[in-house]
Amino acid sequence: MLAGLAGVALIMAWRAALEDTLYIPRLDRVAAPILDGDAPDAAWRLAKPIIVPTGFGGNLGGKGNSAVEIRAVHDGKWVYFRFTWEDPTRSLKHLPLVKREDGWHVLHDRYDRADERAFFEDKFAALITNLPIVIPGDHTYRGGPTPIADKPGTLSQRGLHLTSAPGVAMEVWQWKASSGGLRGRIDKNHFDRPADPTRAQTAGEVLYRGGYIPDSRATSLYGDNFEAQPVGGYERPIPPKRLPTDWKATYAALGKVDLEPDQGDSEGSRWWMTMAESEPYSSDRDARIPVGAVIPGSLILAEDPAQRADIKGAARWGVGKWTLEVARRLDAEYPDVPIGSNTRMWVAVFDHAQTYHTRHIRPVRLELQR
């Protein structure tokens, strides 16, 4: 009997050493938080935060690390998270286009290799699963330039995401500042078994994603303001898909324009265009825009990017930190992940980087009050 109790205690101590627990109180007499990226809601005062140190990322003032504070509450139908992470700059410049004498050029640094680290929006991601994983390792990722023996290598040379078996539910939320994120949009992606590559992917001409499955609705809600190019293709002039109806108003909406990647963007600036603010490219309209003009590289294709979503959020940056508030339904069907006690979470910070994100080993185990 004593030996059995000692064994249970040892297992519990071992698990506690390998994971953090986020206690999520139930809202009974307090209203659910308003999703606005601001902190004063009474609901958040009920939630005890945990701090998750993340590292091995890109930029972030040259440090490559960011501490992420997580709080959460639930009301029996929805769970509400508040993520606050360190980021010295508000980065909204997402692959902007600048007009030169020979035409329009996409500002980038390795975007053709899926490894943009300069002209990219800030992002944040959270992975959730109900698998009892305490060290993600081979369950979600293979590293190196050729991570999977019978599949193409990665253009970035830094590995692929996947699942270790078919039918495993792994859901990845991704908030993207200029691709609908500041309008309430959060992508809901998934990891699965590695997909079969296309001929172009096998030849190393275009990106191979392994088992990463992007949100199927994303392409109808936002996109780049230029056609995708193969490796090396962004070094030549590329016409925008759309030009601003009023280029001066669009330029003014960018705020103070500083094309130094490590310089943050001003509050209220918008580095994206909507359909209502733009028209399909034409040489006549192009001729009215002077050399030196800068236009957004991100297009918002839908009036409300967060429409009919079962996950939504709002974010705000200030004093070197982003705060993102997220609401997600608790129930879900495969391939989504129902959220409950023992759901595990990992988070990642992207500072104006496409794929070069921070990471951490110990999962956050969720524990919901009944």
Segments from the language model and where they lie:
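Acidic/polar low-complexity flexible segments
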Residues: 13-38, 97-288, 292, 318, ...
